Amino acid sequence: MLTWILEREGLNPGFLIGGVPFGFEGSARLGQGPFVVEADEYDSAFFDKRSKFVHYKPQTLVVNNLEFDHADIFADLNAIQTQFHHLVRCIPSSGHIIASKSDAIDEVLNRGCWTPVSRLYTGSPDDWSLQARDKHFGEFEISSPAGDRGAITWGLIGRHNAENALAAV
């Protein structure tokens, strides 16, 4: 979604995404503008058991969710949180982390973070939030910590899509 927004704004983003994004011809492109990577915590290779995402060295990180996955690689949620902590520590102090509110993500950030963090949907007026205008999230309102508001009506449905849109904004 972020790649699509950047493209529509004429920024010609580079990207590496697990599938072919809507409106694009492939799953990767070098581009001329910002570079977007869709990444997860799966290990890099049989000889490098670190999560792939620690090799990317991002300036900006969006963490939408963190849950137990990849039981073939990780023993438990704590093992995954450790990998996310390594990722968070890769972001420079001049960077930016955008993170949704969850106990699992909070635990990672509480382990140590020197990067400014914007929080999503915590219920606090100091954070970014969204409010559904219909039960399917086909219409919703976004609010910024500064009090700015914007309404979105689109053809997608589901809270997860609305949350992705909020993170992209």
Descriptions of predicted regions:
Residues 43-57:
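Switch II of P-loop NTPase G domains
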Residues 1-15:
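A conserved segment at the C-terminal end of the G1
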